[in-house]
Amino acid sequence: MSEQRRATTHLIGGFSGGLVSAIILQPFDLLKTRLQQDKTSTLWKTLKSIETPSQLWRGALPSCIRTSVGSAMYLTMLNSIRQAISKGKNTGSTGSSYLPQLNMYENMFSGAVTRALTGLITMPITVIKVRYESTLYQYTSLRYATSHIFRTEGLRGFFRGFGATALRDAPYAGLYMLFYDRMKVLVPTLLPSNVVKLNSDNRYSTYASTLINGSSAFSAAVIATSITAPFDTVKTRMQLEPAKFHSFTSTFWHIATKESVRNLFAGISLRLTRKAFSAGIAWGIYEEIVKKFV
C-alpha cells in the first residue's frame, strides 16, 4: 500500500472515531464545562438548569469539528511518528492491532509531542466550543461567538489557555499511549479463552480485537484523565474568564488557596466518563478501520 493511501486510512479512521464519540458524548462535555465555571455548582443543580434535552447538545457542532478533525490529525501524525521511531527496529504488534509496539519512553514521547501540536492547531475551535457551552456567554451563533472573541480579544483570544491545555493534553496523551500499549497485552489474559482465539494470521477476530482495543483505551483513559484533571479545570477557567485568570500558575494557585484543592478536580466524574468512553469508541473504530484497509 502506498504511503498516501496509508495516511488517508489513518485520517478516515481517526475522523470517524472522533465524530461518533463527539456526537454521543457531547452532554458530558457541556455539563463538565458548566460545573467548572461555577465553584458552588453541583451536578444536580446543573442538570436542573437544563430546560430541554436538546440543550445538552449545545456546542455540539464545534465539538464535532474539533474532535473529528483533531482526532484525524492526531492519529495520522501519531502513526507517522511511531512508524519513524520503530523503523529499523523489531517492534512487533499485538494480535488486536497493526500499530507498532514501542517502549515506555517512546510511547510517552510520541503521544505528548503529537497531542501538543494537534492542540495548538485546534485551539481556536476549543475556545469557541467552551465559551459556547458556558452560561457566562450568551452567544446566539458560532459566527457571533467567533466575531466577538476576535473583536474583544484579537487573535490571542483564540489561543487563550493553550499553556494549560498543553500541560494537560501532552502528559495525558503520553500517559495514555503508555498504558494503552500495556493494556492491549494485559486485557487478552483477562478474557475467556474462547473469545481471544488467534486465527491463522495470528490475529484476533473483529469482535475480540474491538473488545480488547476498546477496553484498553477505556482503562488507559481513566488512569491518564485522573492524573491530569487539575490541568483541565485550570484550562477551562482561563478560557471562560480571561480578564480574571491570566496565567496557569496564578489560576492554579487561586483555585487551590482561595477556593479549595477539591475544586481542581471539579467535573472529574464527567470528564472521566466522557474521556474513557470517547477513547473506547474512537480507538475501537480507528483500530478496526486501520486493520481492514492498511
UniProtKB/Swiss-Prot annotation:
Keywords: Membrane, Mitochondrion, Mitochondrion inner membrane, Repeat, Transmembrane, Transmembrane helix, Transport
GO molecular function annotation: glycine transmembrane transporter activity
GO biological process: glycine import into mitochondrion
Top-level taxon of the source organism: Eukaryota
Transmembrane intervals: 11-36, 59-85, 108-133, 161-184, 212-238, 267-285
Catalytic activity: glycine(in) = glycine(out)
Main subcellular location: mitochondrion
Signal peptide region: none
InterPro entries: Hem25/SLC25A38, Mit_carrier, Mitochondrial_sb/sol_carrier, Mt_carrier_dom_sf
Alphabetized PROSITE patterns for the sequence: SOLCAR
GO cellular component: mitochondrial inner membrane
Cellular location(s): Mitochondrion inner membrane
Solcar repeats: 5-84, 102-186, 208-292
Membrane-topology annotation of the record: Multi-pass membrane protein
Function: Mitochondrial glycine transporter that imports glycine into the mitochondrial matrix. Plays an important role in providing glycine for the first enzymatic step in heme biosynthesis, the condensation of glycine with succinyl-CoA to produce 5-aminolevulinate (ALA) in the mitochondrial matrix.
Homology family: Belongs to the mitochondrial carrier (TC 2.A.29) family. SLC25A38 subfamily.
Protein name (database record): Mitochondrial glycine transporter
Native organism: Kluyveromyces lactis (strain ATCC 8585 / CBS 2359 / DSM 70799 / NBRC 1267 / NRRL Y-1140 / WM37) (Yeast)
